[in-house]
């Protein structure tokens, strides 16, 4: 519809340019009729009608004009970024044209693995929500969430006062979830110090001795084996053992496991980005070995990115008020989630546990879990991907704040996966998807996409299994099977608004399914414990067979 109106508008404009005389002749009678006096006066009604008509035409033209201007501006900025990237490192970087020419001559293209400067390009930019919250209409939605939090607090206080006869300000759920926090602290310090020292020491030792070694391949395999032992043995099994041996509560487990995954990904990126530089230096017989400094590696360990670079765009100053505001919002989101569980989830599952497991109970549970599930989704996104990452970016003067894009406008799941979490997506894209294509040939794009999905799904399921103390692969099934299917079926060719509605509907339903199934399983294991559980008892769903006893 818009396209037809746009074409008709262009046709009218082109006709007016082709026949200026006819157009002028047509305008003259109208002008004369407008200026013709009626009893010595201009027809005011006709003048007002003409003005209203011109205003309506201008309003019709306005969206087309703004859309054209926005399109041209986006093209201009994109071309500017591409030119800037091609001129990086004083013009020494490979251009897109040269890479494409090389690919024609070498189908496997293993020698054309892009050097670090040709991967992700970091530029100074603000987070999207920081820009949107400057608009009054968007900020009102933010205020609505704050008002909802106030109502949750009032509801909890009033109900507790009626039940207990006094104001109850105990946060028992929070204190339980974050229990045994000293264990979390010393475990994190061990993970950090080992990640800071071992990968850097191994890489430095390998890089300095590679060109001098008489057996460079054996030397590389030996150091690579030591690095894998560190990644799998120390960072892999160490934190997991602490979490299980000390029986930490869920939130404390999440902190350790997420930090474990973050350190593994950062160590991999550091080695992956710097090894090609050393190999190229040895091939060119350079006198200097490109080894990053300790300060550069330390900055990367805290920077809100999983892609290593020697330097990043930096802001000139730190806005400490902005940092304090971001951390305050993170703590506000924690309390928000607490009240959601307290007012929406706990009453729901208290009633569910009084009924035997059935299809009716399951369906009601899923649909009743949609609202709290969606609220938790929004709060998790806002607290971590916006507030937490922006707080550390501001403290480190890290310039590139594009931690997410406008995922809420997605009309396809492929676009949603790319824009929901840009930080993790970049790592998966360059080190799972692109490296798979580089190693196995660029003809297996579907297999490379499947590999990236598999890595993400397995890591998510591992985190949930360890943190909840049971294996219940609901997320894996939704992500690996339904997510993969939607990624191919509902692809980027779907642009109509109805697909955005479908995306939101399935996202809401999926979050309801996750919250319902995992909460049911959690309550079932609390109320139907086994005396001597075997390994199969940890992977067999307890909620399917548990009958609650009171």
UniProtKB/Swiss-Prot annotation:
The keyword Endoplasmic reticulum applies. The active site is at residue 460. Its EC number is 2.3.1.26. The modification Phosphoserine is found at residue 8. GO terms for cellular component: endoplasmic reticulum membrane. Keywords: Acetylation, Acyltransferase, Cholesterol metabolism, Disulfide bond, Endoplasmic reticulum, Lipid metabolism, Membrane, Phosphoprotein, Steroid metabolism, Sterol metabolism, Transferase, Transmembrane, Transmembrane helix. InterPro entries: MBOAT_fam, Oat_ACAT_DAG_ARE, Sterol_acyltranf_meta. Residues 1-138, 207-218, 277-319, 396-443, 491-496 are cytoplasmic. A motif (FYXDWWN motif) lies at residues 403-409. It catalyses: a sterol + a long-chain fatty acyl-CoA = a long-chain 3-hydroxysterol ester + CoA; cholesterol + an acyl-CoA = a cholesterol ester + CoA; cholesterol + (9Z)-octadecenoyl-CoA = cholesteryl (9Z-octadecenoate) + CoA; cholesterol + hexadecanoyl-CoA = cholesteryl hexadecanoate + CoA. Residues 15-34 have a biased composition (Basic and acidic residues). Residues 1-36 are annotated as: Disordered. Cholesterol binds at residue 137. The keyword Nucleus does not apply. Belongs to the membrane-bound acyltransferase family. Sterol o-acyltransferase subfamily. Catalyzes the formation of fatty acid-cholesterol esters, which are less soluble in membranes than cholesterol. Plays a role in lipoprotein assembly and dietary cholesterol absorption. Preferentially utilizes oleoyl-CoA ((9Z)-octadecenoyl-CoA) as a substrate: shows a higher activity towards an acyl-CoA substrate with a double bond at the delta-9 position (9Z) than towards saturated acyl-CoA or an unsaturated acyl-CoA with a double bond at the delta-7 (7Z) or delta-11 (11Z) positions. This is Sterol O-acyltransferase 1. It comes from Macaca fascicularis. The gene is SOAT1.
């Amino acid at each position: 519809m818009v396209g037809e109106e746009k074409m008709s508008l262009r046709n009218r404009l082109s006709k007016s340019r082709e026949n200026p005389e006819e157009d002028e002749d047509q305008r003259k009678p109208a002008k004369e009729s407008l200026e013709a006096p009626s009893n010595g006066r201009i027809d005011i009604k006709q003048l007002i009608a003409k003005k209203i008509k011109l205003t309506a035409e201008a309003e019709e033209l306005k969206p087309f004009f703004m859309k054209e201007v926005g399109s041209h501006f986006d093209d201009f900025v994109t071309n500017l970024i591409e030119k800037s990237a091609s001129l990086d490192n004083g013009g020494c970087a490979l251009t897109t044209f040269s890479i494409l020419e090389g690919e024609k001559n070498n189908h496997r293209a293993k020698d054309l693995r892009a050097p670090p400067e040709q991967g992700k390009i970091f530029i100074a930019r603000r987070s999207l929500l920081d820009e949107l919250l400057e608009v009054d209409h968007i900020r009102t939605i933010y205020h609505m969430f704050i008002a909802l939090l106030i109502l949750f607090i009032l509801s909890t206080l009033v109900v507790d006062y009626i039940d207990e006869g006094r104001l109850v300000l105990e946060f028992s759920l929070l204190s339980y979830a974050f229990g045994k926090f000293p264990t979390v602290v010393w475990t994190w310090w061990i993970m950090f110090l080992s990640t800071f020292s071992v990968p850097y020491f191994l890489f430095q030792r390998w890089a300095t001795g590679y060109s001098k070694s008489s057996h460079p391949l054996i030397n590389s395999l030996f150091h690579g084996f030591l690095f894998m032992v560190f990644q799998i043995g120390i960072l892999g099994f160490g934190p997991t053992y602490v979490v299980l041996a000390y029986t930490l509560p869920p939130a404390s487990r999440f902190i350790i496991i997420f930090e474990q995954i973050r350190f593994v990904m950062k160590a991999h990126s550091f080695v992956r980005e710097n090894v090609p530089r050393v190999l190229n230096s040895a091939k060119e017989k350079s006198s200097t070995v490109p080894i990053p400094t300790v300060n550069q590696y330390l900055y990367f360990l805290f920077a809100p990115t999983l892609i290593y670079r020697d330097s990043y765009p930096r802001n000139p100053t730190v806005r400490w008020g902005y940092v304090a505001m971001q951390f305050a919002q993170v703590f506000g989101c924690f309390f928000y989630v607490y009240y959601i569980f307290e007012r929406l989830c706990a009453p729901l599952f208290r009633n569910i546990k009084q009924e035997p497991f059935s299809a009716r109970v399951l369906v009601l549970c899923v649909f009743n879990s949609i609202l709290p599930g969606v609220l938790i989704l929004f709060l998790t996104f806002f607290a971590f991907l916006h507030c937490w990452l922006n707080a550390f970016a501001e403290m480190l003067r890290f310039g590139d704040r594009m931690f997410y894009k406008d995922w809420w406008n997605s009309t396809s799941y492929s676009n949603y996966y790319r824009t929901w979490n840009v930080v993790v997506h970049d790592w998966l894209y360059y080190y799972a998807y692109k490296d798979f294509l580089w190693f196995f040939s660029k003809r297996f794009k579907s297999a490379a996409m499947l590999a990236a999905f598999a890595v993400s799904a397995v890591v998510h399921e591992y985190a949930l299994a360890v943190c909840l103390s049971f294996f219940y692969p609901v997320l894996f099934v939704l992500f690996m099977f339904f997510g993969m299917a939607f990624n191919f079926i509902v692809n980027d060719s779907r642009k109509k608004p109805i697909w955005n509605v479908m995306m939101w509907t399935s996202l809401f339903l999926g979050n309801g399914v996750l919250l319902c199934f995992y909460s049911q399983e959690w309550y079932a294991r609390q109320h139907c414990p086994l005396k001597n559980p075997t390994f199969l008892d940890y992977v067999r769903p307890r909620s399917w067979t548990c009958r609650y006893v009171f």
